[in-house]
Amino acid sequence: MTAAASTLALNLARKLYETGIRSQSVLSAVANTPRELFLDNALAHKAYENTALPIGQGQTISQPYIVARMTELLLQTQPNKVLEIGTGSGYQAAILAQLVPQLCTIERIKALQIQARQRLKRLDLHNVSFKYGDGWQGWHNKGPFDGILVTAAASKVPEALLAQLSDGGVLLIPVGEDAQQLLKITRTGQSFESQIIEAVKFVPLINGELA
């Protein structure tokens, strides 16, 4: 990161602290991640604003607050292996890869997946496995997962993701269409406990792959 970008990233982390993010590891990851790397040059000047931004293909890079909030919630159980549904730009994956031993991430849009893989390689983040595929189905061969984080809103909670949670594992997923809620679902044996965290606004989680 350039000195200017480093200062902006640190200021963003401070703003996130002011909005309620308390995990120092999450704030440090935000401060160490060049968000402009995950945006087109035309939007790079907005990289450290606390707002979602378009990345093409009808998708967005999530607001830094929600990235930090979901990451903080996920880390409460100290997960070893995490599945991300919706790689998108790769920014959320870059944050997670600094904080968990093993990250698996799925993207249904091939062009975005290729870009994200290149960006994480550039940041020397090598504990990430990438898959081009349908996020609704999860990644059965890599499961079970201690944590699953979904970066798009589902109309309902996908059964495949619940099945791929380990005992004690946590699924964080936005659910709903017009009115969306971020849910935290914890697995205990064959039971699942759901907690509403807060209202959110995400792009929809769509079935299938897009070349």
Swiss-Prot record:
GO terms for molecular function: protein-L-isoaspartate (D-aspartate) O-methyltransferase activity. SUPFAM superfamilies: S-adenosyl-L-methionine-dependent methyltransferases. The keyword S-adenosyl-L-methionine applies. Keywords: Cytoplasm, Methyltransferase, S-adenosyl-L-methionine, Transferase. Pfam families: PCMT. GO terms for cellular component: cytoplasm. The active site is at residue 62. It comes from the Bacteria. Its EC number is 2.1.1.77. Catalyzes the methyl esterification of L-isoaspartyl residues in peptides and proteins that result from spontaneous decomposition of normal L-aspartyl and L-asparaginyl residues. It plays a role in the repair and/or degradation of damaged proteins. Belongs to the methyltransferase superfamily. L-isoaspartyl/D-aspartyl protein methyltransferase family. This is Protein-L-isoaspartate O-methyltransferase. It comes from Shewanella denitrificans (strain OS217 / ATCC BAA-1090 / DSM 15013).
